[in-house]
């Protein structure tokens, strides 16, 4: 803050003449800087010693002295930011960057992307919003879910984009013949980010706390208890088989924090700073798997850069630019893919809405031009007719003779694309004689949504992680949507069917069972997918190892920068 005050005072001195020499009195300068004459003399002396200006006073009260400037405020700001970053004072650098968006873009350009700072390879990412606090358990945002996987470790993990779990804190595991006892063998050289050695008893304590969370208790409903059966072994004892257990433990929500320090993990990066305007990760020197190639990752929270009217390339949270978005020429698209995750529409059948009417609504969505004419940025979404690859939506005959209800209620939550979808659907149904009441739940999940009970139609999105089929099983088990969407008997039957599917030791049988469940939901017009996103990551030259993962981010441990002048 002291540097920012010095810069602001310098700008006040500079501004009246735009840097031209000035003939001015000490009294006028003090008034300009909102300070005493004594203080402005100190200010002039310090600025002159720093080489910013020259002040030639004339003897006698009220005499005009000569003020000459040697640096512009912009160059001084850049120098101050460089000095702040070299000394590890990221907060001071961000304070110095408090400018209008169009000026901020050009100012931040030299500092974003990959930089070697004090011989430390650092990657800086401008981001459009503050991040929610990190904690084990379910997290609403894609960025937070990705960060949880970089900061915390689990007993198992997904390696890259593989859908099969592999060892993490546990190097191997074994399952009893009846599927009711799972032994996880814990590595002997594990350390928390604070340097403490990880004890197996701590992992048991963290797991027990995690499973006490309501949503996590639902996910692990088959677990009877967890025991430390050896200093290097955790044993899960189940009351019914669950062959998804290793998958459940590998997902981001099952990562473990220190039982006494909830932000201390054991993943490849530790949290150094976590504040609304800055998040800094630093590599964990005692990480038990492959060490990161970067020393630090920083999120600079600069929402003003992401205003559509400014024309930045970071138009949407699924399109990440590592580096300053205004310099399109220097950024290159390094990775892109179509997400398996999707936005969806569900319909609650009731005396107000029959199955046949629900089918006609789904036909309207997929057979009309509705999805193809959404006024969204080109290349952002792709209309889909599959829930997952190979899980196609059903085809029904023309149902235009089926009368729609006179009135229906739609409730939807983020992402923002569903604003457009809701508006288009409301206008279309009005032309069909159906009045659609639209209610927006301003959140990323259905948690806490009071309007679900009265909704006929719901829209939201479903992120697909590393194991697509398993992720959908987790959705059916844990999302607040389904108890409101289905009748009590239908929901109980769904949960019993999921229990039967999870008891199949062969993964192909489990996948087939899940596909049958979702095929039934689509065939009975309860669920239909709408569109997928196009994930994109752009980076400036010299930032390497960037490869999209299933969450639309990239593994921070794989990114690297060549040394300067190499």
Language model features by range: what are they?
Residues 349-392, 518-526:
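Periplasmic-binding protein-like
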Residues 433-477:
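Periplasmic binding protein-like
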Residues 126-175:
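N-terminal lobe/hinge region of extracytoplasmic solute-binding protein
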Residues 19-22, 41-43, 140-142, 172-215:
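Aromatic- and charge-enriched surface segment that lines or borders ligand/interaction sites
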Residues 66, 216-261, 266-275:
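Surface-exposed binding/hinge segments that line
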Residues 474-540:
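Extracytoplasmic/peripheral linker and loop segments enriched in polar/acidic and small residues
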Residues 539-566:
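Long beta-strand-rich cores associated with HINT superfamily self-processing modules
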Residues 286-328:
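Ligand-site clamp/hinge motif
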């Amino acid at each position: 803050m002291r540097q920012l005050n010095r810069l602001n005072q310098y700008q006040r001195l500079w501004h009246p003449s735009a840097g031209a020499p000035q003939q001015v009195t000490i009294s006028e300068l003090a008034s300009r800087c909102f300070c005493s004459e004594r203080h402005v003399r100190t200010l002039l002396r310090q600025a002159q010693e720093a080489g910013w200006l020259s002040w030639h006073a004339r003897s006698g009260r009220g005499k005009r002295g000569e003020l000459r400037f040697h640096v512009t405020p912009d160059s001084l700001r850049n120098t101050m930011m460089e000095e702040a970053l070299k000394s590890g004072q990221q907060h001071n650098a961000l304070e110095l960057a408090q400018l209008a968006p169009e000026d901020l873009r050009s100012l931040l350009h030299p500092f974003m992307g990959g930089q070697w700072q004090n011989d430390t390879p650092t990657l800086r990412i401008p981001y459009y919003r503050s991040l929610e606090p990190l904690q084990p358990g379910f997290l609403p945002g894609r960025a937070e879910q990705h960060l949880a996987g970089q900061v915390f470790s689990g007993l198992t993990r997904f390696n890259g984009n593989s859908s099969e779990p592999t060892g993490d804190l546990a190097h191997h595991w074994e399952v009893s013949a009846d599927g009711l006892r799972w032994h996880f063998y814990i590595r002997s050289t594990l350390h928390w980010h604070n340097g403490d050695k990880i004890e197996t008893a701590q992992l048991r304590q963290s797991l027990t706390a995690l499973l006490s969370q309501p949503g996590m208790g639902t996910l692990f409903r088959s677990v009877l208890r967890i025991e430390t059966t050896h200093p290097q072994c955790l044993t899960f004892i189940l009351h019914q088989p669950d062959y998804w257990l290793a998958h459940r433990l590998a997902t981001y929500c099952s990562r473990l924090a220190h039982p006494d320090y909830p932000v201390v993990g054991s993943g490849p990066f530790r949290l150094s700073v976590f504040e609304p305007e800055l998040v800094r990760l630093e590599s964990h020197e005692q990480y038990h798997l492959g060490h990161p190639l970067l020393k630090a990752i920083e999120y600079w929270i600069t929402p003003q850069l992401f205003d559509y009217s400014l024309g930045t390339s970071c138009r949407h949270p699924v399109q990440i630019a590592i580096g300053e978005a205004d310099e399109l020429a220097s950024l290159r698209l390094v990775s892109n893919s179509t997400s398996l995750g999707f936005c969806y529409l569900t319909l609650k059948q009731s005396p107000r809405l029959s199955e046949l009417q629900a089918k006609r609504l789904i036909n309207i969505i997929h057979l009309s031009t509705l999805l193809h004419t959404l006024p969204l940025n080109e290349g952002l979404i792709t209309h889909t007719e599959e829930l997952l690859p190979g899980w196609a939506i059903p085809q029904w005959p023309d149902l235009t003779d089926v009368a729609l209800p006179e009135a229906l209620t739609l409730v939807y939550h983020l992402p923002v694309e569903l604003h457009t979808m809701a508006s288009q659907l409301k206008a279309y149904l009005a032309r069909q004689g159906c009045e659609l009441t639209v209610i927006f739940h301003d959140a990323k999940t259905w948690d806490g949504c009071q309007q679900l009970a009265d909704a006929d139609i719901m829209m939201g999105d479903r992120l697909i992680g590393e194991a697509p089929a398993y992720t959908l099983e987790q959705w059916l088990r844990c999302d607040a949507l389904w108890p409101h969407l289905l009748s009590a008997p239908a929901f109980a039957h769904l949960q019993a069917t999921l229990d039967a599917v999870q008891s199949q030791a062969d993964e192909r049988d489990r996948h087939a069972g899940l596909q049958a469940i979702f095929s039934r939901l689509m065939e009975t017009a309860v669920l239909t997918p709408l569109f997928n996103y196009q994930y994109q990551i752009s980076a400036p030259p010299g930032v390497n190892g960037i490869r999209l993962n299933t969450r639309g981010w990239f593994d921070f441990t794989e990114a690297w920068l060549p040394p300067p002048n190499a």
